[in-house]
Amino acid sequence: MIRAFDAVSLPLLRWLDPEDAHRLAIQGLKLWPPVKPRPDDSKLAVRAFGLNFSNPVGIAAGFDKNAEAPDALLRLGFGFVEVGTVTPKPQAGNPRPRLFRLERDEAVINRMGFNNEGAEVVLRRLAARAQYGGIVGVNVGANKDSDDRVADYVKLIETFAPLASYFTVNVSSPNTPGLRNLQQAAALDDLLARVIDARERVRAAAGDTPVLLKIAPDLSLGELDDVVHIARSRRVDGMIVANTTLSRSPTLRERTKMNEQGGLSGRPLFRLSTRMVAETFVRAEGAFPLIGVGGIDSGGAALTKIRAGATLVQLYSALVYKGLGLVESIKADLASTLLRTDRDSLAEIVGADAPMITAEEWPV
């Protein structure tokens, strides 16, 4: 069924404006039949952040910003779904056009600007689907016009703790002016201290909801040293590596679109984000698991991310070019690799290549 859907939908959606195509895809998923997915190979099961994942392949934040279709995505075979980014108040985001396909590069540039319907609407949707279970994380951010951005994160932690499987503290989007400044050492330490304190305040009523930190791939290694040190000292439960990049490789072929302002994702981000996964893994020293994201478009790419240090992986941009059937393809490739190498679980290879990757020349 998924293959047939991709065969029909991908060519049609490619003719539409990228944002209109995305909106149509969300509407289509809301109509997806309630068919249970095929059971995952038991070897793909992963335990991380105190949660049990049936497989390691998740969909990254940005696809289902407003929690409109998390259950359809789970039925398509994702091991987990991350909704958002959600802000306390609704906001329209940046003016259109703000989403661009770089088709020859299998990449996307976006400058969306945290457009979302706000915490109240997303909370209502998550409450309505809570009975169905599944791992649904909530990616949280600050409103562009907020007078106290840290207070925005705290409010969202307190609001969503009863319903979120985990939180992602997003301080790495390049499309909200000044947001990435929260990755600087003093600001990040204050933010994480207040976020973890908020989580502890609601623990009795909401449980121990894991808190993850999502970082940019454009950090220097010195900045990464500080970020990982603070994340460890504040006892975050994990990190997501990495968000979109502001850099533009000279190898990009879409020479006009490559100059659009915004964050670049997709295949050109793969080498940089994988290097950052490995660098983070080495610095974390097993203190917490990582989710690797950036340019994953095949089972081989997912395996490379895992061997670099990712316990779980996420994808989004590749769906634009490969379709929803990519999820099952990646899982099949991972299961086949475990069978071929006589391994019982992916945990046996997490970070196996990190020392080698961190010794390589920096990717351009």
Curated annotation (Swiss-Prot):
Gene Ontology molecular function, alphabetical: dihydroorotate dehydrogenase (quinone) activity
Alphabetical GO biological process terms: 'de novo' pyrimidine nucleobase biosynthetic process; 'de novo' UMP biosynthetic process
Reactions it catalyzes: (S)-dihydroorotate + a quinone = orotate + a quinol
Pathway: Pyrimidine metabolism; UMP biosynthesis via de novo pathway; orotate from (S)-dihydroorotate (quinone route): step 1/1
Enzyme class: oxidoreductase
Cofactor(s) the protein requires to work: FMN
Record note on cofactor: Binds 1 FMN per subunit.
Oligomeric form and interacting partners: Monomer.
Protein name: Dihydroorotate dehydrogenase (quinone)
Organism from which the protein derives: Rhodopseudomonas palustris (strain ATCC BAA-98 / CGA009)
